[in-house]
From Swiss-Prot:
The keyword Protein biosynthesis applies. It holds the Pfam family Elong-fact-P_C. PANTHER family: ELONGATION FACTOR P, TRANSLATION ELONGATION FACTOR KOW-LIKE DOMAIN-CONTAINING PROTEIN. This is Elongation factor P. It comes from Wolbachia pipientis subsp. Culex pipiens (strain wPip). Pathway: Protein biosynthesis; polypeptide chain elongation.
Amino acid sequence: MAERANDIRPGQVLEHNGGLFSVISIMHTQPGKGGAYIQAEMKNIQTGAKYYERFRSDATIRRAILDEEEYVYLFTEGNIVNLMHPSSYEQIVINLDLLGEKKAYLQDNMKIKVVTYQDKIISAHVPDHVTLTVKETESVIKGQTVTASYKPAILENGIRVNVPQFIKEGDKIVLHTPDNSYYERVKE
């Protein structure tokens, strides 16, 4: 879909120089001499490389049309992840590397968002919040309750995270996956 460069927004995906680029940030600039332009910070979806591009504000850019579908995680075999569409029961396989560091969060029956461009899978995402059990943590140190303090913990999948002092071994917690941070304790 062709648009003016003035309409670029962070989060959009553009077709540019033969690749797909996710817009990270933009800055409109009106110099004292010459025409206005847009400075865009972009990330190549295939390679992950950051890229800076300057567009004239009246230039035409092409926004990529992406399809996003939710699949259910079945199992991992080597470097291959098997997923199933919840309504059609169609099974697909994706490369484990598409999930990056987030592959440690995979759990049975987890919903995985798969993004495609022209019927080719370009990315996959785990949910923003995942429930995990605390496998190992330090005991509470008395007198450290004046300010919000955190202690290290190891979760069932081996990830290390800082948790509040009241969390004990065996507690279930919700983890915020985009930044690997504690979100809340599961209420039972």
